[in-house]
Amino acid sequence: QKDFFLPSLNLKYNLSEKHSLRLGASKTYTLPQAKEISPYRYVGVNFNSQGNANLKPSDNYNVDLKWDFNPTPTELISLTAFYKLIKNPISRIEVASAGGYLSYENIADKATVAGVEVEVRKNLFVRPLSSAANGMNKLSFGLNGSYIYTNAKMPLATVTTGSQLEGAAPWIANFDLSHNFTKGNHSFINTLVFNYVSDKIYTIGTQGYQDIIEQGMMTLDFVSQAK
């Protein structure tokens, strides 16, 4: 049994009616998932895996600084810088064995995570209908993108000098274009959504094995809603 002391600090300073700064600092922890700590073998579609009962929880020390600009109540431009120190990070590894299976380890004493994130929500036009029609015609878009740097010196890894953390994609981007037509008690919303995630490490290679890379992907979806 382990006791956790988890302090948290959040500060906000309004530079003006439309500009604000936020500072956050906290300590959190990550417990191993059931499949990561269970000693039983799991048979998957692509890989078999087995948990590690000796895994330790990860301690996370987080700091972020955020600037918000609200041109209007429904619009936003935001920029965030963040840093995280992780003690005893948990990662999936490939075990050198005849059966070839994946397991989980506290892969390093510590790991660092740093990055920036930008978010934009903008109205391209907002046109009220006539007072008799009681409605609105609105076109808007949203953009969210981030770059994440991760690094850890891993004694168990094939490349011990430093590697990305498992599951952390360096580049992530999301974009949506939405048309909202409202008239009386009825509304029609059509949204085009684009998402991109870059290549990321699926499994960290050990004992001569190379890292297994999960290929990045792009998706494009169209969502229509009426009520």
Which role fits each region the language model picked out?
Residues 7-15, 19-27, 63-71, 75-83, ...:
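Membrane-embedded beta-strands that build the outer-membrane beta-barrel scaffold
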Residues 1, 34-40, 47-48, 89-97, ...:
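Outer-membrane beta-barrel translocator domains and adjoining extracellular loop/strand segments
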Residues 24, 34-36, 184-186:
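Surface-exposed loop/interface segments of Gram-negative outer-membrane beta-barrel transport/assembly proteins
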Residues 207-214, 221-225:
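Short, glycine/charged-rich beta-strand-loop motifs at protein surfaces that mediate ligand recognition
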Residues 81-85, 102-200:
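Gram-negative outer-membrane beta-barrel transporters
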Residues 29-86, 96-127, 168-171, 213-216:
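Outer-membrane beta-barrel signature, preferentially recognizing the C-terminal barrel domain
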Residues 2-5, 13, 57, 110, ...:
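Conserved structured core elements
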Residues 4, 62, 125-130, 183, ...:
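Subset of outer-membrane beta-barrel
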